[in-house]
Swiss-Prot record:
Its EC number is 2.7.4.9. It is an enzyme of class 2 (transferase). This is Thymidylate kinase. GO terms for molecular function: ATP binding; dTMP kinase activity. Belongs to the thymidylate kinase family. GO terms for biological process: dTDP biosynthetic process; dTTP biosynthetic process; dUDP biosynthetic process. The keyword ATP-binding applies. Phosphorylation of dTMP to form dTDP in both de novo and salvage pathways of dTTP synthesis. It comes from Pseudomonas paraeruginosa (strain DSM 24068 / PA7) (Pseudomonas aeruginosa (strain PA7)).
Length: 210
């Protein structure tokens, strides 16, 4: 049995975690096994790498160091959580995955796409999301939401130019592969965003059981 791999992407403050939990609840109501997870993180070791990546530090982190740590955490996460859950037939709902690496380390940091693609192939093999939900939001709104949550992590402290590049990379990737991506307007009221998720449910269930 093979499950379904769904990733949720978007900039800071876009509501990915809230909507991931909502989608999980709706799927579980229909008797579907759901594996909730996130990146970077998802296993104890990967969560320790997450701490390194997010904690502000007096020592600047080189962009390639950041990239390699992301994929180190991802390798552990895939082996320990994602592949086993898919093998059980579960729906994996993952808050960020490799699209975030293209957006943040590629778009934001300016690292070559080919470098990211090489690591993607090495670490993931043929594993790719079945569906990616991109929660799109104007940068200023996302940053205001992130600031309202309290202390900012290392990424949230980046400037507007960084996040504009992140947003545009997400939208470009979605436009290049519309069969895999669904872009949702995260600036709408939460109830409207979640109504959009409800409309996706029949297709998700058909793909899972089809």
């Amino acid at each position: 049995m093979t499950g379904l791999f769904v990733t949720l992407e978007g900039p800071e403050g876009a509501g990915k975690s809230t909507n991931r939990d909502y989608l999980a609840e709706r799927l579980r109501e229909r008797g579907v096994e759901v594996q909730l997870t996130r990146e970077p993180g998802g296993t104890p070791l990967a969560e320790r790498i997450r701490e390194l990546l997010l904690a502000p530090s007096d020592e600047p982190m080189a962009a390639d160091t950041e990239l390699l740590l992301m994929f180190a955490a991802r390798a552990q996460h895939i082996a320990g959580v994602i592949r086993p859950a898919l093998a059980r037939g579960a729906v994996v709902l993952c808050d960020r995955f490799t699209d975030a690496t293209y957006a943040y380390q590629g778009g934001g940091r300016g690292l070559p796409e080919a470098r990211i693609a090489a690591l993607e192939s090495f670490v993931q093999g043929d594993l790719r999301p079945d569906l990616t939900l991109v929660f799109d939001l104007p940068v200023e709104i996302g940053l205001a939401r992130a600031a309202a949550r309290g202390r900012l992590d290392r990424f949230e402290q980046e400037d507007r130019r960084f996040f504009e590049a992140v947003r545009q990379t997400y939208l470009q990737r979605a436009a290049q592969a519309p069969q895999r991506y669904q872009v949702l307007d995260a600036g709408l009221p939460l109830a409207e965003v979640q109504a959009g998720l409800d409309r996706l449910l029949p297709n998700l269930l058909e793909r899972l059981h089809g």
